[in-house]
Amino acid sequence: RYNVDESIPHLNSSWRQKICLWSFSVVDHFDLSRDVVAVSMSLFDRFLATRGNRCNGSTARLASLAVLHIAIKVNEVQRIKLGTLANFSRGQFGPRDIEEMEWNVLTSLDWKIHPPTSMSFVSHLLLLLPPQIDDACKEEIYSLSRYITELSFCESAFVETNPSSVAFAAILISLED
């Protein structure tokens, strides 16, 4: 399991991967859709971009809590209390800290918090497969494409890649297998 309070000495691909894996562990713990992580990481990346991609480890950890909470509220019926989420910081942040960071994120992004995700593109693109392909095969393509897109969330090299391009590439790779 990954904890949000792990050391993030400087913002690079390893900190992003830790935040992404931690986010997956939280959504898995609460049995939420893994698509929440795609939205959360998009919010995180766009928030950092408004700050010139400059952020210390503490701010990155707090922002990761805030964007995950926003993504859960926007995409899930189930709610996670701020106090519960704050517990994942092992006392480093309280509910009020997360709430203030949420406001900071929302205003920085002009409330544009529902980005298209690579998984939504995968779902739509798979509808274009020929009807001759059986459902079991389509499900296999979907599962592998989903896995590939989830890997892309954790990789900083894909931050500036359009979600539709990631989805298309994931499907092409899935079709090769």
Which residues does each predicted region cover?
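Short acidic, glycine/proline-enriched loop segments that cap or flank alpha-helices
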Residues: 55, 133-137, 154-162
